[in-house]
Amino acid sequence: MLDAKYIKDNLEEVAEKLATRGYQFDIAEFKAQEAKRKDLQERTQELQSQRNTISKEIGKRKSKGEDASDIFAKVNDINDELKVIEKVLKDLQDCINNTLLSMPNLPADDVPVGKDESENVEIKKWGTPREFHPEAQAKDHADIGEILNMIDFKAAAKITGSRFVVLKSKIAKLHRALTQFMLDMHTEKHGYEELYVPYMVNNDSLYGTGQLPKFSEDLFKLEGDFEYSLIPTAEVPITNLVRDEILDTESLPRYYTAHTPCFRSEAGSYGRDTKGLIRQHQFEKVELVHITIADKGEESLELLTSHAEKVLQKLNLPYRVVKLCTGDMGFSAKKTYDLEVWIPSQNTYREISSCSWCGDFQARRMKARHKNPSMKKPELVHTLNGSGLAVGRTLLAIIENYQQEDGSIMIPEALINYMGGISVIK
């Protein structure tokens, strides 16, 4: 959530920046609401002052044994008006809060302005995409897996429905090996603390990281006595660890990682990526989360992104880094780098990780702060998150980039030990 005071002091700037994100901020309406709120608060203070004065007068009369019935009525009238104002003020404040909750984060100054992914800016490339023989074009990962009888979409459709998968045998083992490889790298090489977190969260957590109220349709919600939702990403439970906390500044930065399934309805993506593992209702990620101080926020984004890159480099998967434009960034993000891995069958790069610096946007929603003895009052932390990596998309990238003409799949050297010495799937 944006700082209400900053908005009031910088209305035109905020409106311009929000417009680059496709959000139309009605300045006149906001000013009118703020003016009305101020008037109501001033009237409340005025009435409370009158009530206090009258109450003192009643006390004086009673102490002297005098009748005070003539001014009791005034107190009752004031109390009645205060109740009306309280209701109006609450409704108005709820309206203002809903407006604030609907606003996306303001982009950092170096974020390119653009309407969608076509205007993202490529930062760099790593690795060289493999060239396939003209007579042996790259096969799609879904076809390779089905021929090997190790990826089964039909079984998943029978069990559940579309956009689910059953992995079998050595490909299921490869999926598990990837997860362990990523966790080991981040905990042993990059200094992350590994967490095991709930896969269901309450609404407060979803408001804290920005999934609610805007993205309610993309969530799978439980029915019955529990108002919980399945997590769309481990970012939600991990980041909410610091909700309503005042952290010791000396304990920052904090680096957290967790492997979880993620559940998304994929509302709005009908007809897109209907084949294969690219877009599933249930998929797994190894998530990276940083909690740091404001001065280190942008620097931490570079570090987090490099940690996700290391996974791709160790697996020798060609990729590129793109800086997202204003129109393509996530709701809570201030600045985002996407890592896109090369997919031979599509002859293009596809997103495998999104690394975002959220500034104090989530922290303000969560009331997540830090303090040290030299500070007059607690300050909001900065939060960052990214995939390190999406396991299913890494799996499909390996299947396609390491496919052989005979239909087998070579195992990247970094994973052979995790595969129990298996070097090829056939």
From Swiss-Prot:
Its primary localisation, in coarse terms, equals cytoplasm
Binding-site residues, ATP: R264, S265, E266, E351, I352, S353, S354
Q: Which GO terms describe its biological process?
A: selenocysteine biosynthetic process; seryl-tRNA aminoacylation
Checking InterPro entries in the record gives: aa-tRNA-synt_IIb, aa-tRNA-synth_II, aa-tRNA-synth_II/BPL/LPL, Ser-tRNA-ligase_type_1, Ser-tRNA-synth_1_N, SerRS_1_N_sf, SerRS_core, tRNA-bd_arm
Q: Listed disulfide bonds for this chain?
A: none
- UniProt catalytic activity: tRNA(Ser) + L-serine + ATP = L-seryl-tRNA(Ser) + AMP + diphosphate + H(+); tRNA(Sec) + L-serine + ATP = L-seryl-tRNA(Sec) + AMP + diphosphate + H(+)
Gene3D superfamilies membership: Bira Bifunctional Protein, Domain 2, Serine-tRNA synthetase, tRNA binding domain
Q: What does this protein do?
A: Catalyzes the attachment of serine to tRNA(Ser). Is also able to aminoacylate tRNA(Sec) with serine, to form the misacylated tRNA L-seryl-tRNA(Sec), which will be further converted into selenocysteinyl-tRNA(Sec).
Q: What does the entry note on its domains?
A: Consists of two distinct domains, a catalytic core and a N-terminal extension that is involved in tRNA binding.
Summary of subunit composition and partner proteins: Homodimer. The tRNA molecule binds across the dimer.
Please state what the protein is called.
Serine--tRNA ligase
Which organism's genome codes for this protein? Francisella philomiragia subsp. philomiragia (strain ATCC 25017 / CCUG 19701 / FSC 153 / O#319-036)
Q: Which gene encodes it?
A: serS
